[in-house]
Amino acid sequence: MSEETLSKKQITRLNKLQKRLRREVGSAIADYNMIEEGDTVMCCLSGGKDSYAMLDILVNLLQRAPVNFNLVAVNLDQKQPGFPEDILPAYLDSLKVPYHILEKDTYSIVKDKIPEGKTTCSLCSRLRRGTLYGFAQKIGATKIALGHHRDDIIETMFLNMFYAGKLKAMPPKLLSDDGANVVIRPLAYSREKDIAEYAELKAFPIIPCNLCGSQENLKRAAVKEMLKSWDKQFPGRIETIFTAMQNTSPSQGVDRDQFDFVSLKQDPDAPMKGDVAESDLPAFDFLDLANSGHIDLDAAKRSSDLLKIDVVSTYTP
């Protein structure tokens, strides 16, 4: 499929997806101040649907963004067997985007360290990340753009909860441990299914990600299936989960490193409250015997109203 052969219905759908993805990327960039005046953004291109979509949207953003920035695409050829070396250069030449194709045989390292049949993705990604971080410094890139989307972020949170005992995900913007690189994820607000459909309609020249023969990450696959089931059974739940991730309250949690529970003390000089809402009352019941329900103390301003209140279950020694 190519854009020239799309039906009228498909073109309409493509335009709708394009507007949605561009809007979401623009919002994510603005919310997290991902791209600033004079930045050089190194767009990491793997050949998968996500990185293609990210590059496509960032190229468009170059022309209309309120700030001036430079964009350079970078692909790391990790010497996996069967990797088509001509696809990405041809595609990037057609876009007229500056790019670098790096070569580093991390495949041999991974095969040497990981037993046959085991998932190699974790080690492979760490080696790839180290190479890309170093190259970003070499070319003076101020931001490293990765193609992780909203589903990746949510899946990572549940993986860490279930298997690592941590409430930790992928931040839309990250400073590397050594402080040398800033990583951004412009697709942080975008759904994987929208990206997949967009990539198909745009006919990106996708390169398979399993050329190495690695087994699928079964834990991530299980979490992905769980979220897919929730999305089908409870529409809106995934959106609510992501919203919750943006609205954390350390004082209402149990992590002592995030909030100083140990030092919490009552303030003896705190002013006494006059009229109080029912939610602020101590742990005994105020009952309105007239209607056998709770009475609104804020509405009970007259003394005759207050006579209706019967205080129960109190004790004075």
UniProtKB/Swiss-Prot annotation:
Its EC number is 2.8.1.-. It comes from the Bacteria. [4Fe-4S] cluster binds at C121, C124, C212. Signal peptide: none annotated. It is an enzyme of class 2 (transferase). Pathway: tRNA modification. Pfam families: ATP_bind_3. A motif (PP-loop motif) lies at residues 46-51. Keywords: 4Fe-4S, ATP-binding, Cytoplasm, Iron, Iron-sulfur, Magnesium, Metal-binding, Nucleotide-binding, RNA-binding, Transferase, tRNA processing, tRNA-binding. Binds 1 [4Fe-4S] cluster per subunit. The cluster is chelated by three Cys residues, the fourth Fe has a free coordination site that may bind a sulfur atom transferred from the persulfide of IscS. Homodimer. Catalyzes the ATP-dependent 2-thiolation of cytidine in position 32 of tRNA, to form 2-thiocytidine (s(2)C32). The sulfur atoms are provided by the cysteine/cysteine desulfurase (IscS) system. NCBIfam families: PRK10696.1. Belongs to the TtcA family. The thiolation reaction likely consists of two steps: a first activation step by ATP to form an adenylated intermediate of the target base of tRNA, and a second nucleophilic substitution step of the sulfur (S) atom supplied by the hydrosulfide attached to the Fe-S cluster. This is tRNA-cytidine(32) 2-sulfurtransferase. The gene is ttcA.
